[in-house]
Amino acid sequence: MGATALPPIWQMYLKDHRIYTFKNWPFLEDCSCTPERMAEAGFIHCPTENEPDLAQCFFCFKELEGWEPDDNPIEEHRKHSPGCAFLTVKKQVEELTVSEFLKLDKQRAKNKIAKETNNKQKEFEETRRTVRQSIEQLAALR
């Protein structure tokens, strides 16, 4: 089975697929945070208009931006997300047993749910604030 037959998120376990996301990465040579080293640390490149160097760990979903040429991706990842299980894997993904892989991916799925829940809570809180302000403004018109 080729890598393209894998679900897209499982393709991110393969370093070459993560490297591919760094097409427009600003640091390519003579620096520590090359696409290769970023991918080794579990990062994918997900730039935005305001954050052209935004990278996210595909596993713990930690987002980091503001990279400097001398930043070490693995050290930065450990510093900002010390509990990321991807950093503790000692084997290449191709060497994992099915059981090891599924256990690892279960943790990734939990991380994704936690990230999405946190984002929804922030979104809800912002909406709540906006609605409350509108209610207070309407009440002031009485």
Curated annotation (Swiss-Prot):
Its main location: cytoplasm. Gene3D superfamilies: Inhibitor Of Apoptosis Protein (2mihbC-IAP-1), Chain A. The modification Phosphothreonine is found at T34, T48, T117. InterPro entries: Baculoviral_IAP (IPR051190), BIR_rpt (IPR001370). It is found in: Cytoplasm; Nucleus; Chromosome; Chromosome, Centromere. Zn(2+) binds at C57, C60, H77, C84. GO terms for cellular component: apical plasma membrane; centriole; chromosome passenger complex; chromosome, centromeric region; cytoplasm; cytoplasmic microtubule; cytosol; interphase microtubule organizing center. GO terms for molecular function: cysteine-type endopeptidase inhibitor activity; cysteine-type endopeptidase inhibitor activity involved in apoptotic process; enzyme binding; identical protein binding; microtubule binding; protein heterodimerization activity; protein homodimerization activity; protein-folding chaperone binding. Keywords: Acetylation, Apoptosis, Cell cycle, Cell division, Centromere, Chromosome, Chromosome partition, Cytoplasm, Cytoskeleton, Kinetochore, Metal-binding, Microtubule, Mitosis, Nucleus, Phosphoprotein, Protease inhibitor, Repressor, Thiol protease inhibitor, Transcription, Transcription regulation, Ubl conjugation, Zinc. CDD domains: BIR. The keyword Transit peptide does not apply. The BIR repeat is necessary and sufficient for LAMTOR5 binding. Belongs to the IAP family. This is Baculoviral IAP repeat-containing protein 5. It comes from Rattus norvegicus.
